[in-house]
Amino acid sequence: VLALDVNSDPYHLALALVSPDGNLRRHLTLSLEEVDRAPNRGAKELLLWKIAHQVVSLAEEHGVAVATERLKHLPKGRRGDGSGRAFRRKQHRFAYASLLRKVHSLARKKGVQVVEVNPQDTSTIGMLKYAPQLSLSKDVAAAYVIGRRALGFKEKLPKGYQKLLGDGAFLVQAWDFYRARAEELRTQKRNERDRSRRNRLSRELKKAQGALSLLSSPLGSPGSQDGFTEGRKRPGANAWRVLRVGTFLPLLGREVPRDLSPLKV
């Protein structure tokens, strides 16, 4: 299959060609910066159709299906008005949704099969497992997971991660980090008078509280293609998410680290 994912910074489409045995055969990116700079909606639509043709032509060249996240998980139109990184990210998602619909439409017209999967945790799994293991960017790694999921593969935790989750000291260290972070954010929020900054602190506090809740829950299954695509849920915290909150910010210093090589095991 040829699997797709999008990245906001730099703004491009990541493609991963995945063989039937689940291995990564090839990967590449298509820049979407020109779409971002398009002077009007008509010009943007033409560029998106051009990229859709490139994607479908690549799938035809290799004789494979196209794998994407399910369209129902994507925004259906433009909303809001504003600027800044968060707004640009939202606009990029709207453009990505439009691009995927074009890819789906064009692929079906040309007789190329389209496989849709639930994208839940594909980015997290990609960043934790394949980005460090195969030296991939996080978006290519996410596309790879989408492709493997479309082929029916289940993502198992590497032994190093299994050992880490079984290490009580790791979980305690992560818990202490987020507890201290939550206390610091509460203090900053109490002393902050600017409304926009208070709102930002509230969002950060909510994330820290969510991490504490996740770290205090018993671990469930690390997840599988079946569980995600068919909607079945297993009890307990998702092990991939526990690893993400336990490693990214406490150990690597960022919620979405650019360099994931320290996680290579």
Model-derived regions, located:
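Positively charged, helix-rich recognition surfaces that bind polyanionic ligands
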Residues: 1-265
